[in-house]
């Protein structure tokens, strides 16, 4: 039986003969032959191991080959629909760019640019000059530098200013960010020497003062943006640390994390320290993210005193950590939105979604509910109140009131429906709880409605 099945396996040339010319030209003969060999060998191995009792036909092998090559051509990084209500979803790409920032990236990608060319002098220029001016205008800093992420920014600052020197940090601020990246490890890699002061829940100004030695290179303050310590607590403000630092002639570095440029508490969100407030308190160097709360491209932005920034720019690590033209293009336009606060709120998707009016979200929920009326034979839809979150390790206490679309079905349980939506050609990421699938309308975009309808329709008709 086994020998008969092995003899029945189709020959590669026979299978090639039934492909149309377009498919052969599009994929190339060598690629198709390689895929067919793998498919036939897999079938042969399964026959020998008595895992199957059939040999593929030419047509079956052809179909498998087409499917495999089509799958290989699919993008690994693809569009997904965020129905979770987590605005800055770390796993779904964090912040979305504005329309104008997206266009700027496309232009930088599809044409030559003055990335490192001084158009006035007709000679080599600096990529950092393209964006330093706008950062200074918005923050009031003397100088600025952009690298590829905030962890890189803080490491570069410490290595440039505090190599082989002691850096004093409160134990309550030795944070861990995503992917197990911890401030102590970043400091160790920068060759700065960590000096911990205070306790996890309480640190006093005298703790900082008592830790000062001849080897002290800086005070480091780290904003705990992704957690809160409550109860019997005490921390030292940046302003108080700066007063002590000025008296002792020690620089102050602050990592404020998410990069808030606007006081969002006026829009009902949790109060977070802004970059401007940090600089005004006397901090010498501030680092923050270019995406997350700022709403731009992933980057680490360093602002502060010119004498320190100039020294950081000369560090050999700066070139290793430099940003590309796409990041600069996206970040420049995003920052220019901030020249007008109203424009920033309306055009930067992250800010727009976080400050979205509850009535607007309800309107969205009603619109989606109405759009899905034709699918009532497959599902039961209802609208419920709920809560969204900011995400991205920002504002851990902020809960944003929202409206959710609840989806129930007698044909498919919530676990399988969530999986089907997640595995759809344009994946739809949802919430599952209380025995149903939920879509949070806060993070649903205008182009998402049709995709949601089509996905639910196809799943219902299976």
From Swiss-Prot:
One of its GO terms (molecular function) is L-seryl-tRNA(Sec) selenium transferase activity. The keyword Protein transport does not apply. InterPro entries: PyrdxlP-dep_Trfase (IPR015424), PyrdxlP-dep_Trfase_major (IPR015421), SelA-like (IPR018319), SelA_trans (IPR004534). Gene3D superfamilies: 3.90.1150.180, Type I PLP-dependent aspartate aminotransferase-like (Major domain). The modification N6-(pyridoxal phosphate)lysine is found at residue 292. Pfam families: SelA. Belongs to the SelA family. Converts seryl-tRNA(Sec) to selenocysteinyl-tRNA(Sec) required for selenoprotein biosynthesis. This is L-seryl-tRNA(Sec) selenium transferase. It comes from Clostridium perfringens (strain 13 / Type A). The gene is selA.
